[in-house]
Regions:
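Internal amphipathic alpha-helical repeat/solenoid segments
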Residues: 1-85
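TPR-repeat structural position
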Residues: 3, 45, 65, 85, ...
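TPR repeat positional signature
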Residues: 9, 20, 27, 45, ...
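Structural motif corresponding to the intra-repeat A-B loop/turn of tetratricopeptide repeats
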Residues: 42, 62, 82, 101-102, ...
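Amphipathic alpha-helical segments of tetratricopeptide repeats
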Residues: 56-57, 76-77, 96-97, 115-116, ...
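Solenoidal tandem-repeat scaffolds enriched in leucines and small polar residues
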Residues: 115-192
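Structured C-terminal portions of repeat-based eukaryotic scaffold domains
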Residues: 164-226
């Protein structure tokens, strides 16, 4: 039956993953290190990284999110140790994707580790995307203050790369929450006006400026009322 076949495939994937983890550990063992006097230690490390990544993929396939995140973390730590920083950041992002299924706080920690690497490498668009992801995770958990902070950071990094469209999306989130949740109307007004003035300078966006200016007017009315 189909359910039996599915269970069998999951079982096979997990068994393969366990074998790959075991293989990686052997390659990194001191005994293995001494065997590489005539070989390449670097190659063994690369092999171990590959084993951990493949194990992560297999655990992910079987929806064993905890083991998958652990395998990606081990790969990421090894990559970082050997200065493969971009690869390490990617591993941490993969670990976070698995962790967000059951442990959002730890998922966020991994995303922050990846952001730190991407900022150091000058890859600000990647850093912005991950801040945006963290903002969404906090938003889902209704932790809106933290969410807004990360939307702001995402907007800043998008600005660095002159990516106005995505920066604007994040800033609108900040302004909407500033006005609707926190009663910070002055902050919201400044953001809405900034967005409107930019839209007015860009011919194809001019029509959008009305929305932002209307929201700014509403915020002014709220200040007058309260």
């Amino acid at each position: 039956s189909q359910p039996d076949q599915a269970r069998q495939l999951i079982s096979q994937a997990e068994e393969q993953a366990r074998q790959l983890i075991s293989e990686a550990e052997k390659k990194l063992s001191p005994k293995s290190f001494f065997q590489t006097i005539f070989g390449s230690y670097k190659n063994r490390t690369e092999d171990a990284i590959e084993c951990y990544q493949k194990a992560g993929n297999l655990y992910r396939l079987s929806k064993n999110w905890f083991q998958a995140s652990t395998a990606y973390k081990l790969s990421g730590d090894l990559n970082l140790e050997h200065n493969n920083r971009s690869e390490a950041a990617n591993d941490y992002v993969q670990a976070a994707k698995c962790l967000e299924k059951f442990d959002v706080n730890n998922a966020i920690k991994f995303l922050l580790s990846a952001i730190e690497i991407y900022v150091d490498l000058g890859r600000f668009t990647m850093a912005a995307k991950l801040h945006n992801k963290i903002a969404e995770l906090y938003e889902q958990g209704l932790e809106l203050e933290e969410s807004v902070q990360h939307y702001e950071q995402a907007a800043d990094y998008y600005r660095v790369e002159d990516n106005y469209v995505y920066s604007k999306k994040c800033l609108l989130k900040v302004a909407d929450y500033a006005s609707s949740e926190f009663g910070n109307y002055n902050k919201a007004i400044n953001i809405y006006q900034e967005i409107a003035f930019y839209d007015l300078k860009t011919q194809i966006l001019q029509y959008n400026a009305k929305d932002s200016l209307f929201k700014a007017v509403l915020c002014h009315l709220c200040i007058d009322l309260f």
